[in-house]
Amino acid sequence: MEDKKSRPGPRPGGRSALVQAAVHRAVRDIQAQGDAQQLTIPAIAEKAGVTPSTIYRRWGTLAELLSDVAVENLRPDHEPEDCGNFRADLLAWIEQYIEEISSVPGRNMLRTVLAVDKPQNRVQCTTYTLEQVEVIRQRALARGEAVPAGDAILDRLVAPLIYRLLFASEQPDRARIETLVDALLVDG
């Protein structure tokens, strides 16, 4: 009998990762068709080539699965643009971030992540944002610029803009964004 301790853990890119990728792809495909009635676990399972029980076992509910897919879709696909100085880098990044998040799909993804009691998904969204902010900060520090902490950028720039998007349904304009960035740079 094989000792459980000697068995390797899940392989990165193994069967579990392939199942997750297939299920996520099936969700995105069905969402792209625009028919919310078709977004069911049996339909997703059929499209992904897995059984519904596989989805229930891994995600539990449709809402949790949709939250996982939303988190994956919120992952940035490239580093922030390097514009030559911290202020310009931060402005370029936050404007693009807000443009993406304020789109109908972006708002829907945020609401989906927030609707499910799955704190690790919200933490992952924060991690993605902090990683982007940290790239900008490290570039600026390498240029010898003084920069605020990453948490200060989240609290004083990102959070107020996200709040307005979600609760005031307000698309922040460039003037508001610049005001927040400049206040952050003055007060650190």
What kind of feature is each model-predicted range?
Residues 1-47:
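Basic, helix-initiating cap at the start of DNA-binding domains
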Residues 41, 70-77:
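Short, basic, alpha-helical segments at the C-terminal edge of helix-turn-helix-like DNA-binding modules
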Residues 48-52:
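Short coil turns linking two alpha-helices in DNA-binding domains
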Residues 78-107:
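Hydrophobic alpha-helical connector segments
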Residues 99-100, 118-143:
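Amphipathic alpha-helical packing segments from all-alpha helical-bundle domains
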